[in-house]
Design a protein with these regions (language model features):
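Core catalytic region of metal-dependent phosphoesterases/phosphodiesterases
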Residues: 3-5, 10-116
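Conserved beta-sheet core of the metallophosphoesterase superfamily
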Residues: 107-110, 114-139
């Protein structure tokens, strides 16, 4: 079975609801730490997916500043992985390339799509997977 997710943003503290009520941060994820958030994301994915399933990650796994950490976190995911790169993933790849880890990162995936989208067939449906908005002017 195929599953789809986007904007995981492993390790992004700015996404957490600020415990101090600081209005400058507009995080919406209800975790006390990025470690708790990362663990819950992994737990939820693994509770839903099996090793026979494919998880399409439609952009934004992490940020450039925690690119190395994303490798160890992705290794905990059970399903096969396909990455359609989003805007933050380009920085992740660049940071990993600078450290000689790009190949290690990409080896965790069945496919890495560096373009803007991927067209797949899932059952009777054709799906255009893209991290970016798509407008269909024909309808």
């Amino acid at each position: 079975m195929n599953y789809y997710i986007s904007d995981i943003h492993f390790g992004n503290e700015a996404l957490l609801i600020p415990p101090d009520g600081n209005e400058a941060r507009k995080g919406t994820r209800p975790f006390s730490s990025v470690e708790e958030m990362n663990e819950k994301i992994i737990e939820n994915i693994n509770d839903c997916c099996t090793a026979e399933d494919t998880l399409y990650i439609i952009g934004d796994i992490a940020q450039f500043y925690n690119a190395e950490e994303s490798i160890s976190l992705l290794k905990h995911l059970v399903p096969k992985l396909v990455l359609i790169m989003g805007n933050h993933d380009k920085g992740v790849i660049a940071a990993l390339k600078a450290k000689g880890l790009e190949v290690t990162f990409k080896s965790l995936f069945e496919r890495v799509i560096s373009g803007d989208s991927l067209l797949i067939r899932d059952g009777k449906y054709d799906l255009l997977l893209s991290h970016y908005p798509v407008v269909n002017l024909a309808t």
